[in-house]
Amino acid sequence: MEAVEANTLQQERLQAIAEKRKRQTEIENKRRQLEDDRRQLQHLKSKALRERWLLEGAPSSASEEDEAMKKQMQEDEVKTKELEETIQRLERELESLENSSSVTSTKENLAEAAAPAKEEKKENIPSVQKSPLGTAIAEKKVSSSPMKAVQGTDMMKAAMYSVEITVEKDRVTGETKVLSSTTLLPQNHCVQGIKVYEDELKVVHAVSAEDGALQNGAQPLSSSEVDELLHKADEVTLGEATASGDAPGSATSSQKATPRREITGLQAKPRENSTEGAEPSREQPVTMIFMGYQNVEDENETKKVLGLEGTIKAELVVIEDAESKAEPEGKDHAPPNGTALEPAAAPLQGDEVPGGQKPGTNATEAKEAEPDMDAKKQRCKCCTVM
C-alpha cells in the first residue's frame, strides 16, 4: 500500500514538472510571436506614413502608379488592423498562461511539502509501535535521579548524577539545616527511601534515618522547598571548598602580609634653575674656558645680542699655567685683559727729571692717568660653563 502511494506521488510530481516545462515553452513561443508582430506592425505604420506623404506631394492627375499605391495602402491598413488584433489576443493569452503557471507552481510546492510530512508521520507511527519496553527514548528529558520508574510501565531513565544531602530538621522551629552534600555517580547509588518530590528533571527520595526507619513518615516536598534545599547544599559545598583552599595557602598569605621595609638613605633634592648659573664650591667645581673679553656699556643689551644670557659673572679672572705657578708668590698677576705688566721704572735719583719737568708734575700726571686705566679694566664677560 505504501509503495503504491509512493509511486502515485512520484508520477504526479513528474507529470506536474512536465506540464510546467510545456507551459513555459508555450509562454516563450507566445512572447517571441508577440515581439515579431509588434515589429511588423511598426514597419507597416512607417511604410503607410511614407506613402501618404508621397501621395500628398504628387500632382492631382490620376495615373496607374497612383492607383497601385493607393491599393497597396489599403492592403497595408488591413494587415495593420489584423496585426493589432493578433497582438491583443497574444497579450491576453500570455497573461492567462502566466497566471495559470503561478497557480500550478504553488499547488506543486504545497504537494511537495505535504508529501514529506505524510512520510514522516508514517515513519514515526511504526517506530513508536515497534519500540520495545525497557528502552530509553533519546528525545525525552533526562532525570537527575539515579533511576526513574514510570507509573504503569517498566521503562527506566538513566540519571546524569545524584546528590546525597544530609539534613537536620529542628522539630521546634521547623528550620532545616544542611550538614553535608556529596555528589555521587548514578551507578554507585541505588534508589532508597520514599519518593517525596518528582518533576521532569529531578526526583527526591527521603532516605531512612540512622536507626534505619523513617520517623513519623515522609511528607511530600514542594518545588520551592526542593530549590531551597539545593541552594543550601550548594552553599555548604562552596564553604567546604573555601575552607580546604585556605588551609594550604596560610603560609603564602603570611608571606604576603609582611610589611615592606623602608630603606633610609640620601634624599635627592631637585636642582633649582637660576639665571645666575651654578655657584662654584669645593663640592661642585666649575670648569671654564677663556673665550676672550669685550668692553660693554649696556650689559643686558649685549647679553641678548651676543647670546651670553646664563653666563657666570666673574669679578676677577686669573689666567695661569704650570710655569706661572712655579714663579714666586710675590710676583704680581697679569691684568684681566691678558697683557703683561710693564716693569716698574727705576726711581729717578735726585731731582733729575727728563724734559726738565719737576717731580711734582709727574706725580700729578700719574694720578690723572689712573681713572683712565680703571675705565678700560671693565669686568670680564667672557667665560662660559662647559
Swiss-Prot record:
Pfam families: Paralemmin
Modification after translation, per record: Phosphorylated.
Coiled-coil features, chain-numbered ranges: 4-115
GO BP terms in the entry: adenylate cyclase-inhibiting G protein-coupled receptor signaling pathway; cellular response to electrical stimulus; cytoskeleton organization; negative regulation of adenylate cyclase activity; positive regulation of dendritic spine development; positive regulation of filopodium assembly; protein localization; protein localization to plasma membrane
Region (Disordered): 21-40, 51-149, 240-290, 321-378
Lipid attachment points (S-palmitoyl cysteine): 380, 382
Keywords assigned: Cell membrane, Cell projection, Cell shape, Coiled coil, Lipoprotein, Membrane, Methylation, Palmitate, Phosphoprotein, Prenylation, Synapse
Biased composition, class Low complexity, residue ranges: 97-116
Highest taxon listed in the record's lineage: Eukaryota
Bilayer disposition of the protein: Lipid-anchor
Chain positions found as Cysteine methyl ester: 383
Lipid-attached positions, S-farnesyl cysteine: 383
Annotated localization: Cell membrane; Cell projection, Filopodium membrane; Cell projection, Axon; Cell projection, Dendrite
GO cellular component: apicolateral plasma membrane; axon; basolateral plasma membrane; cytoplasm; dendritic spine; filopodium; filopodium membrane; intracellular anatomical structure
Family, similarity comment: Belongs to the paralemmin family.
Function field: Involved in plasma membrane dynamics and cell process formation. Isoform 1 and isoform 2 are necessary for axonal and dendritic filopodia induction, for dendritic spine maturation and synapse formation in a palmitoylation-dependent manner.
Protein name: Paralemmin-1
Taxonomic source organism: Gallus gallus (Chicken)
